[in-house]
UniProtKB/Swiss-Prot annotation:
EC top class named in words: transferase
Ranges where the B12-binding domain occurs: 772-907
Domain Hcy-binding: 19-338
Protein name per Swiss-Prot or TrEMBL: Methionine synthase
Record text on subunit structure and interactions: Monomer. Dimer. Forms a multiprotein complex with MMACHC, MMADHC and MTRR.
Gene that this sequence comes from: MTR
CDD domains linked to this entry: methionine_synthase_B12_BD (cd02069), MeTr (cd00740)
Binding site for Zn(2+): 260, 323-324
Protein's cellular compartments: Cytoplasm
InterPro entries in UniProt: Cbl-bd_cap (IPR003759), Cobalamin-bd (IPR006158), Cobalamin-bd_sf (IPR036724), Dihydropteroate_synth-like_sf (IPR011005), HCY_dom (IPR003726), HCY_dom_sf (IPR036589), Met_Synthase/Corrinoid (IPR050554), Met_synthase_B12-bd (IPR033706)
Modified residues (Phosphothreonine): 1264
Species of the source: Bos taurus
Amino acid sequence: MAPTLQDLTPSAGMKKTLQDEIEAILQERIMVLDGGMGTMIQRHKLSEEDFRGQEFKDHARPLKGNNDILSITQPNVIYQIHKEYLLAGADIIETNTFSSTSIAQADYGLEHLAYRMNMCSAGVARKAAEDISLQTGIKRYVAGALGPTNKTLSVSPSVERPDYRNITFDELVEAYKEQAKGLLDGGVDILLIETIFDTANAKAALFAVQKLFEEEYVPRPVFISGTIVDKSGRTLSGQTGEAFVISVSHADPLCIGLNCALGAAEMRPFIETIGKCTTAYVLCYPNAGLPNTFGDYDETPHVMAMHLKDFAVDGLVNIVGGCCGTTPDHIREIAEAVKNCKPRVPPATVFEGHMLLSGLEPFRIGPYTNFVNIGERCNVAGSRRFAKLIMAGNYEEALSVAKMQVEMGAQVLDINMDDGMLDGPSAMTRFCNFIASEPDIAKVPLCIDSSNFAVIEAGLKCCQGKCIVNSISLKEGEDDFLEKARKIKKFGAAVVVMAFDEEGQATETDPKIRVCTRAYHLLLKKLGFNPNDIIFDPNILTIGTGMEEHNLYAVNFINATKVIKETLPGAKVSGGLSNLSFSFRGMEAIREAMHGVFLYHAIKFGMDMGIVNAGSLPVYDDIHKELLQLCEDLIWNRDPEATEKLLHYAQTQGKGGKKVIQTDEWRNGPLEERLEYALVKGIEKYIIEDTEEARLNQEKYPRPLNIIEGPLMNGMKIVGDLFGAGKMFLPQVIKSARVMKKAVGHLIPFMEKEREETKVLTGKIEDEDPYQGTIVLATVKGDVHDIGKNIVGVVLGCNNFRVIDLGVMTPCDKILKAALDHKADIIGLSGLITPSLDEMIFVAKEMERLAIKIPLLIGGATTSRTHTAVKIAPRYSAPVIHVLDASKSVVVCSQLLDENLKDEYFEEILEEYEDIRQDHYESLKERRYLTLRQARENGFHIDWLSEPPPVKPTFLGTRVFEDYDLQKLVDYIDWKPFFDVWQLRGKYPNRGFPKIFDDKTVGEEAKKVYDDAQNMLQALISQKKLQARGVVGFWPAQSIQDDIHLYAEGAVPQASEPIATFYGLRQQAEKDSASSDPYLCLSDFIAPLHSGIPDYLGLFAVACFGVEELSKAYEEECDDYSSIMVKALGDRLAEAFAEELHERARRELWGYCSGEQLAVADLRRLRYEGIRPAPGYPSQPDHTEKLTVWRLADVEQRTGIRLTESLAMAPASAVSGLYFSNLKSKYFAVGKISKDQIEDYASRKNMSVAEVEKWLGPILGYDTD
């Protein structure tokens, strides 16, 4: 049983003594925290049995990797780790409790042990600290670590349901409360809430801790440490560092800082930010640098110590330590490095006199802040549109109201769900959760507005930022008022206090002042409320009602505001503006004018903020003079007839509007400007007309070539410059190229005529080349994918390069012949599938053999800088350069062809690639692999006898789907890869579809391309320009070790020969010692032959036909944009076909999930049961396995989908794979494998080792050269 407050308080103020003790040290020197616990546990290489110990030897779930259980099962190991850190110089050690909440432990089935786990961990750390304190004579401290849990309050686990949460605030509070009790009972000195990726979770932890300190325990010092996940300077849930500090400072932490995710060098700017916005001490315990490609940490103790010493010398820190990858050696060096450095001196105040609020971003309201607009339209009582949407349950559309308010200038967003037909707490929770999913809205603080305190609490539990509560009052007396205010303070919110007490609503000036003054002193004296967090609403009441007693309501508010601001330091004044003009509802022009006039004066008297319709407030000086005077008279009560006069004004004034007239004003400019404008804007309409006008101007352009070299190239140069500067995007560039091609196409007949005439006159042909250089592009032999290559060609063409595009499946000899025939300056090779890599190596070898010494560019989805540097560049003595995408191609080609730059550029590439090769070969030496036998022993072993029996498909054999309805596939299209084709990538928080449309940089262009795609898609479907065909098949199947055998229908597998075999590859790269993950192979998901349990395997192949023909037709019309668009859509339709057919397989064709009801977004997040891995991809990287699919289902004969010699599918818009139904099956990557598996695999497949190595080159864990 937990001790009571009385038990733990033998004398005055333990917290004061302990906090003062630590604070005294912090004022004298920099303290040192310990390093990574997980890192040290891994060094012990503990087995599953070690993790289980005797107590848990029969536990149903694996426990290896559950480091926290070791405090119970292996306390000596944890004690020794603590001791090592203490002897290395740590002043403070953290308990081994990062995942010791019931929430995190539920993954291991140990949630019932959370309290015990924490108490034991605290006890182990306490003993280590006391032993070393006694040994060294230096007191050491124990910090009880409260980790973030594996669930989040601010982010939905479901893309389709942004309002859904799989944990509640109250559940988190209870879990943290249980954890903190165990830590406190175990004897910790400090509570450290750490690795905060979601501030809402941290606020739940702080709420729990504060509750314990209030009710049961003597308070301890609290440390808070957030985690900035990348260089954007934000937490995983999107908050900036300053917003994070504002959100948690209500808990009065002794220390606040950052840990994890970043190395010290990367963390520095964010630690500086933390220090500038807190009066607390600053702690900093980064990782040992950034993780390498294997997820390990390489930063040496010395390097890390020097970084942290720089922090200390510059006065940034009070406590330093280490997180992931750090060891006692790191802590020893860090302690030595900072021991003579002076600690940071915390400022006495920060942002003095400011109200500090936060959403994802900070918002400071100070003496010089302009009037703060609190957006009013997200109020079911104040906005008919919003109310209608909420009542209909259309919360996503209601978000648009919130977004519009922010866009129109609302700095805070008021949310009100008070309606008798609504479940207020539920509606508030749901809408606030929706807001959290939209960073453009969530960036501003929220004002949780309700007359029902249960609704207010519901809203507060959803907000990771520091928000405003609107409102509380003295209406129900002081006890009720203080109870609510105490809760609000515990949530860390500011509060609006209404001028309302036991006697009712204050309408006169003096009662307003009296009620507000009373409330102010209660909050400060009884609760220690920060005066800067108090907002008074002295009641803006309706004027112009026709009742004389209402005429002074505006004047009374303004006068009360002046006194409140003069006599209640720090307090702010707000009010609901729409109340003022309620008598004039329906007369929006009058109401807006009244609001503008009222605010003009109220702000002068000290009103700080107001709930307004952001964006609809007129400027005082812009109000019509007659209307202005009438409003002034009404507000100041200067004319008893003011109301009647305003009504008369409204009735006599008509409404006017303006028409927006669009003109083609650019058409009035000079010819050259018109040509350039058309090219830059991608306007085709007049290009032939203008080009012909230029051609007819023989005086200025005597030859057609002069037009190309002059205004057309000038326009394309502007396009290239804008694209290079990131001010123009790929779809726009391609539209510009389309215009250019039409112009050039118009001129070509005239140029050919001129050439013939020259030949007749002189007997020879002029050698003209206006281009910057000639580049031959080709997709290599056996590969049919060319969207990326085509885009590169268009971009290069726009930058004055002559591009010779040889298309797809181009043999080496054809590539080299074209390069010689066209006197190419550069060759560019493209490929998507892994066999293309070998073909690229072959081309490089041939170029070397034939002494064709021109630069070779390598690109395509399967290529990489490492493969280019290691496998291709050594075969060729001229430049070989990997090009990431079209935007990089121009820069690379320009440098390679610039006489002044090319040699230096080539030298840089040689040095860079040599470094890459060295790193690669070093990494091969360091990698460790299990033997194939060990990997199989540690495979994924399903207890088939206890599993539900596999479902038999509704048919065995194959079924063909002819001319599949494309309209059915549209909803299954995943649009993200579509935007990747066009190199349109939104930045956080606007990544993915449809958020990309909100991106400030690419959003507008993305929407245009998407609209073009929708138009083309509907035309393709309605005009039946494309056809979809596919085949699905199912067979009895059993696994034998790593292979899957298929059998004829009706055969008894144990007594029959298989009709086909799919050969599997198993993971071999050694996993982290703390990991209990199995070494997977696809065969693990099929019942073994010896089990006697019948199982089944499915396969499919689908394609979209007609794409190539349409694309070619567009190219012949000089329309690259439409050519690329139809290919991109063809690929999307093929993938959608695969997705839709897999759904049908699960629900009806196989029927193992007949009741499945998943949203499309859940399909993309792989939330369905079973998998559909494809040969040639991570779970089975061998493309030769496609041959078995094709033979078994007679794919080419039945569908027309064929395989090239490199086993690419043709047409390119095609997808194929296998169907697995086991509920435990999952996607995985085989990763690198060692030679013993290659030899075994070659033997099973009856192939030579060399042939297998050729097909599996990218996953070989050894070098074959």
